[in-house]
């Protein structure tokens, strides 16, 4: 494997629906938004492959940049990059430890380019200096130090051609020109392309061998639509003799499979009846899997290698919280370990495997140490048709004195819906949960059908169910919370981004009496126009979208998508709505928000619309995220009666524009006047 850590990224109870909601204890301090959503102090620590350097992301003049320090002297850190607009959020070390490579886009357009910075000299250069191009890393190896493989879609925006990138000269050499409509490529540790994948007409995939940069005429593996979200190759061992798969074929949950490349024989390495195998730790020298992750209610690392088992046992004995190994040297003598206590900010440590010592490197948000952060409670909720919905509940501080995961009296609640929809909510520190709980709300995040991590049947149960059974799962979660005494039926808001934004619009339009208000962030309102405006580089996944959502190329599909689109039932919306949108969003075009705002305006239905001209699918710049959340918490306070930090001057450093409805959000018009 060419990555040190492979990411694959009962309801009985007393009904108190009529009880008056109780808010958080008044003596609980209000945590300032800046402390929760401002820049972290340090994050994303990495060790260079040779172990001589430490790196991390930290603010420089208010923008997240990369810092480096000698591993022996972390206090001698210096900034390596000097980004002034977009924060750097993804980076990695070159195999020779001489450069740090990072990707960034412009204004949230997701046209990510690759940059390299010399660690000693500090010289930075664009390694893929193209316009309207999105780079992919195809191969990076601990065996080949002087180059990597990248995919670049500057020839045809739909498909990536594979190039070899010389890390010293920056020269790009074509390796495989993708004229066969292949969705992706797989390289081994010698940076030889060994596999290619292509979409099938049923929404599944087929996998081809590649020999001498020529793709075989016939596939060697087939994956149907049912397995398409849960089956893919995961990487080779260093000797190239074993190919690992995450594979749900012949089972429900995805197992970790080892395939003998020469014979094709497959061996089950790990499987779990309740959850997919969600990740693996591979030895940086051999590429062999040494531990795997299972994430049902919580993420659990299960060791295979006895030495790694001893390491994980030691770490568990010394650290309290969710433990993740985030970086390993090539010699595998040093690790960076992150621990998430949930009720405190994440801390990173340098772990010396031989000496069995832990050295504290940093706390991601030291300003939150000692803050009134609260526990997250995993719960299982039954849907009306018998599915188990793994969910996470956070309660306001002071409302659960016995710690049983239920408040002593009902409190207002925010149903926080994840995006994707092919993603999931998980256990761990969650800034939005903590923020809303601090303001006096219970927060419930539910993995509705179509969420990933719980097997292919659970995903497929969401096919063609946007706004219907997927929405029913959210309604069932609210009913569970009411029945459990968590909240009362008239004090529930719905909020989310991307699919969660769609769910918010659907909640207010399809079930107009269910929610007291809604906060939609970059959510689509018209599923037909959503599918017509997806980015060109999503071409390979388009058929799967059509099979799982509805086909906009057929009359029947168009009718289904129209029926499930909140835009066409906007006149049913009765409750307050706040919409946030990035103007450069390549996934959910700004028109998705604009058209429902226009429809509501035409019917004189109140809506507040906040747009950020320098953002895309979400708000990457902390100034903008804080500004929107300032509006949101005051909006929710009016709707649900919780606490709020006044908007104040939160909009001043942001690019927030409010084309419509400032008068419907408390304090917004005044904040705009001061901007």
Predicted regions and their residues:
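Bacterial N-terminal signal peptides
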Residues: 9-18
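Active-site-proximal cap/loop segments of hydrolase catalytic domains
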Residues: 446-675
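Sec/Tat signal peptide C-region and signal peptidase I cleavage site
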Residues: 20-24
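Beta-propeller domains
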Residues: 56-82
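Peripheral, non-catalytic segments that deliver or gate enzyme domains
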Residues: 38-40, 61-66, 83-89, 95-390, ...
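Bacterial N-terminal signal peptides that target proteins for export
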Residues: 1-8
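Mature N-terminal segment immediately following signal peptide/propeptide cleavage
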Residues: 26-61, 65-66
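Cap/lid segment of the alpha/beta-hydrolase catalytic domain
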Residues: 364-493, 497-498, 503, 525, ...
């Amino acid at each position: 494997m060419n990555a040190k850590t492979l990411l694959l990224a009962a309801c009985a109870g007393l009904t108190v629906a009529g009880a008056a909601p109780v808010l958080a204890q008044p003596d609980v301090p209000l945590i300032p938004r800046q402390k929760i959503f401002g820049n972290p102090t340090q994050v994303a620590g990495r060790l260079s492959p040779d172990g001589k350097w430490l790196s991390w992301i930290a603010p420089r003049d208010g923008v997240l940049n990369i810092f480096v320090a000698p591993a022996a002297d972390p206090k001698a850190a210096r900034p390596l990059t000097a980004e002034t607009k977009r924060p750097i959020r993804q980076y990695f070390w070159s195999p020779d430890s001489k450069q740090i490579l990072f990707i960034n886009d412009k204004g949230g357009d997701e046209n990510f380019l690759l940059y390299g910075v010399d660690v000693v000299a500090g010289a930075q250069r664009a390694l893929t200096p193209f316009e309207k191009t999105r780079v992919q890393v195809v191969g990076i190896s601990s065996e080949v130090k002087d180059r990597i493989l990248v995919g670049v879609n500057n020839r045809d925006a739909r498909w990536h051609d594979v190039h070899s990138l010389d890390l010293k000269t920056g020269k790009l050499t074509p390796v495989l020109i993708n004229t066969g409509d292949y969705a992706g490529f797989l390289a081994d540790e010698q940076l030889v392309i060994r596999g290619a994948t292509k979409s099938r007409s049923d929404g599944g995939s087929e996998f081809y061998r590649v020999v001498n940069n020529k793709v075989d005429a016939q596939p060697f593996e087939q994956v149907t639509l049912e397995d398409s979200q849960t089956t893919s190759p995961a990487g080779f061992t260093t000797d190239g003799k074993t190919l690992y798969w995450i594979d749900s074929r012949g089972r429900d949950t995805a197992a970790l499979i080892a395939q003998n490349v020469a014979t094709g024989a497959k061996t089950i390495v790990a499987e779990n009846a309740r959850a997919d195998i969600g990740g693996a730790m591979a030895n940086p020298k051999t590429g062999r899997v040494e531990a795997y992750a299972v994430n049902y209610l919580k993420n659990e690392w299960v060791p295979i290698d006895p030495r790694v088992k001893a390491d994980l046992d030691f770490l568990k004995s010394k650290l309290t919280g969710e433990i993740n190994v985030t970086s390993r040297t090539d010699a595998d003598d040093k690790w960076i370990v992150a621990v998430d206590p949930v009720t405190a900010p994440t801390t990173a440590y340098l772990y010396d495997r031989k000496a069995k010592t832990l050295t504290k490197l940093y706390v991601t948000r030291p300003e939150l140490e000692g803050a009134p952060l609260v526990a997250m409670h995993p719960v299982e909720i039954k849907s009306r048709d018998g599915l188990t919905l793994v969910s996470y509940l956070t309660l306001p501080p002071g409302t659960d004195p016995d710690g049983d995961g239920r408040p002593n009296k009902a409190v207002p609640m925010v149903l926080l819906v994840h995006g994707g929809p092919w993603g999931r909510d998980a256990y761990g520190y969650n800034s939005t949960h903590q923020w809303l709980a601090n303001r006096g709300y219970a927060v419930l995040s539910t993995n509705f059908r179509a969420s990933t991590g719980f097997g292919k049947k659970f995903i497929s149960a969401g096919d063609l169910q946007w706004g219907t059974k997927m929405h029913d799962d959210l309604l069932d979660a609210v009913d569970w919370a009411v029945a459990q005494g968590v909240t009362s039926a008239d004090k529930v808001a719905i909020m989310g981004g991307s699919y969660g934004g769609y769910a918010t619009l659907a909640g207010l339009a399809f079930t107009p009496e269910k929610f007291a208000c809604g906060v939609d962030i970059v959510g689509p309102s018209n599923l037909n126009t959503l599918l017509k405006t997806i980015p060109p580089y999503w071409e390979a996944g388009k058929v799967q979208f059509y099979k799982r959502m509805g086909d906009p190329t057929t009359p029947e599909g168009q009718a289904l998508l129209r029926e499930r689109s909140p835009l066409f039932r906007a006149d049913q919306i009765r409750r307050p709505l706040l919409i946030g949108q990035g103007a450069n969003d390549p996934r959910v075009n700004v028109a998705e928000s604009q058209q429902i705002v226009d429809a509501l305006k035409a019917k004189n239905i109140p809506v507040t619309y906040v747009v950020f001209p320098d953002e895309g699918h979400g708000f990457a710049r902390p100034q903008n995220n804080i500004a929107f959340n300032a509006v949101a918490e005051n909006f929710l306070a009016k709707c649900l009666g919780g606490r709020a930090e006044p908007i104040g001057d939160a909009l001043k450093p942001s690019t927030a524009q409010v084309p419509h409805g400032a008068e419907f959000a408390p304090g917004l018009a005044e904040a705009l006047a001061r901007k």
